[in-house]
C-alpha cells in the first residue's frame, strides 16, 4: 500500500512539474505595429486596447527557444534552431503564440507558419504576405489592403476593403471570395491563383498559368492575360 501511495505521489509530482514547464508564458515586449512569424509557429492574432504576447510550447526547452522580439516596431516570432539541427515540421507543430495588437500595419507569415485571426481586425492600411507553405485565415476591415501570396502559401481572407491590391505567384493561393473590395488590382502568375469579390473596379492580370477569378459584378473590368493566364468571372 505504501509503495502504491509513493508511486502515485511521485506520478503527481512529475505531472505537476510537466504542467509547470508547459504553462503559457506571458512575454513583455516593446510596442509594435507589425508582425513577422516563421518556422512553422502557430500564431493566433486578435485586436485589443492593450498589447499582449503569450507563448506556449511542449516543454521548457522549446519554450525558451521560441523567440518573441521587437525590432524597429516589428514583432518577430521565430524559433532558435541549433547549429546543424535536423529539422522537421513535427518539431514545430506545438509552438504557439497568442498576440493581442492595438494596431497593425503589416503581417508576414513564412516557412510553414500558421496564422489565424478569429475575430474581425480593423486597420487603415495593411500589408500582408504569406509564403513558403505558410497559411493565413483572417477577417480584415481595411481602407487599403495589400496582399502577396507565393511559394505554396495560402491566404483565406474575409471582410471588407475599400481598395485591394493582391498578387499570387509560384503556386500561391489567395481566397478572397468573402472579402468584398470596392476596387481591386489582382495579379496572378506562375501558377498562382486569386479569387476576389469586387463591387466597382477590377484590373486583373494573369500570366504563366496564373488564374484570376472574380465575383461581385464589378462595373468596370480590365483584363490582361498572357502565357496561359486566365481571368474569368464566376
Kindly label every feature range from the protein language model:
Residues 7-15:
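Bacterial N-terminal signal peptides
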Amino acid at each position: 500500500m505504501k509503495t502504491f501511495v509513493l508511486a502515485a505521489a511521485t506520478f503527481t509530482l512529475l505531472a505537476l512539474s510537466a504542467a509547470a514547464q508547459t504553462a503559457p508564458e506571458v512575454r513583455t515586449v516593446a510596442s509594435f505595429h507589425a508582425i513577422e512569424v516563421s518556422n512553422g509557429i502557430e500564431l493566433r492574432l486578435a485586436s485589443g486596447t492593450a498589447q499582449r504576447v503569450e507563448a506556449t510550447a511542449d516543454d521548457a526547452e522549446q519554450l525558451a527557444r521560441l523567440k518573441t522580439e521587437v525590432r524597429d516596431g516589428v514583432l518577430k516570432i521565430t524559433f532558435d534552431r541549433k547549429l546543424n539541427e535536423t529539422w522537421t515540421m513535427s518539431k514545430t507543430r506545438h509552438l504557439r503564440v497568442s498576440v493581442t495588437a492595438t494596431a497593425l500595419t503589416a503581417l508576414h507569415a513564412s516557412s510553414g507558419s500558421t496564422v489565424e485571426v478569429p475575430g474581425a481586425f480593423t486597420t487603415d492600411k495593411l500589408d500582408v504576405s504569406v509564403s513558403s507553405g505558410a497559411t493565413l485565415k483572417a477577417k480584415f476591415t481595411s481602407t487599403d489592403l495589400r496582399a502577396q501570396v507565393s511559394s505554396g502559401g495560402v491566404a483565406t481572407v474575409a471582410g471588407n476593403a475599400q481598395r485591394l491590391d493582391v498578387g499570387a505567384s509560384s503556386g500561391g493561393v489567395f481566397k478572397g471570395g468573402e472579402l468584398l473590395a470596392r476596387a481591386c488590382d489582382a495579379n496572378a502568375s506562375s501558377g498562382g491563383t486569386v479569387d476576389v469579390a469586387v463591387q466597382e473596379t477590377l484590373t486583373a492580370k494573369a500570366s504563366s498559368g496564373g488564374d484570376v477569378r472574380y465575383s461581385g459584378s464589378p462595373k468596370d473590368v480590365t483584363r490582361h492575360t498572357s502565357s496561359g493566364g486566365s481571368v474569368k468571372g464566376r
